[in-house]
Amino acid sequence: MTISTVIAFMSMFLVFVMSGPIVVEGRAFFVFGDSLVDSGNNNYLVTTARADSPPYGIDFPTRRPTGRFSNGLNIPDLISEAIGNEEPPLPYLSPELRGRSLLNGANFASAGIGILNDTGFQFINIIRMYQQLDYFQQYQQRVSRLIGKPQTQRLVSQALVLITVGGNDFVNNYFLFPYSARSRQFTLPDYVRLLISEYKKILLRLNSLGVGRVLVTGAGPLGCAPAELARSGTSNGRCSAELQRAASLYDPQLLQMINELNKKIGRNVFIAANTNQMQEDFLSTPRRYGFVTSKVACCGQGPYNGMGLCTVLSNLCPNRELYVFWDAFHPTEKANRMIVRHILTGTTKYMNPMNLSSALAL
């Protein structure tokens, strides 16, 4: 053996000893869904559903847009913070998601998507739910090459999963315009049953991929977003009755489906978050929670600042802490913090069968 060969061998040995095996620390966090939880995947796609330009991110720690549909932190960021993770999971399409950063989890969410594949067609290129789940499978293969299959299975089974999807199936599909294809095909109750049936398939596939704890959020107060107030032409700020009816049909059936799945599986894999009720509290009495309005968006134009996109040319409020809505559809960071507080410690009025803190303590 030559001296150069010995030196090369010793160098490789020292690198191995110093670096050691990759150890999984903390709890991985995986995120699936739409713009409420997208942390930047759409930045890497040719799509109109983007939040990568100012003033998005105006209150983010870097003061720069990241692809989050928020003035600052979104719900995955705040949950990551609450469960003690140093960083929120990176977007799956981010080139920075490699090596050890994979062990923190990944965010697969994509703005504009819905439960149904035809939802959000107007946004062109988005990561639909089936593709998000395919990416999750791909993620597990990548991590297996890093830490081995048994460790990967353990990482996934002990991880927390958040899935937020369904609102776009109403706003950007059934009620997108009068006499939409889906509204001609289904009555609203039948359409809700279709969504629940398709959502059940998504959750069953997630379960088959080895996850152990899944937080499922409801539709939220769909008819109260500034975009819907502007669209309905209301002058008194009253929420859209048709969209509120949709949410009132959807959320109880979602909870029933989740309870049935847990019973079938034999343990509480799925946790339902009643985000409609959570937001109803500060939508109906905003001043009680330190807001000046729950109807006008901080950033936008037209009635209620609810028309079009939030851009550098839009009206922009000076203090985001006083607004429930950041743009035409999405809550401010302050509102997100209130939602996450309920998710973590809320009673059965908001969380079923238990809140997230109780679930993670099991």
UniProtKB/Swiss-Prot annotation:
Family annotation (PANTHER family): (RAPE) HYPOTHETICAL PROTEIN, GDSL LIPASE/ACYLHYDROLASE FAMILY PROTEIN (AFU_ORTHOLOGUE AFUA_4G14700)
Glycosylation sites: N117, N355
Residues the record marks as active site: S35, D327, H330
Phylogenetic placement of the source organism: Eukaryota, Viridiplantae, Streptophyta, Embryophyta, Tracheophyta
GO biological process: lipid catabolic process
Protein family per UniProt: Belongs to the 'GDSL' lipolytic enzyme family.
GO CC annotation: extracellular region
Domain of life: Eukaryota
Protein's UniProt name: GDSL esterase/lipase At5g18430
EC number: 3.1.1.-
Keywords: Glycoprotein, Hydrolase, Lipid degradation, Lipid metabolism, Secreted, Signal
Subcellular location: Secreted
UniProt GO molecular function: hydrolase activity, acting on ester bonds
CDD domains: SGNH_plant_lipase_like (cd01837)
Signal peptide positions on this chain: 1-19
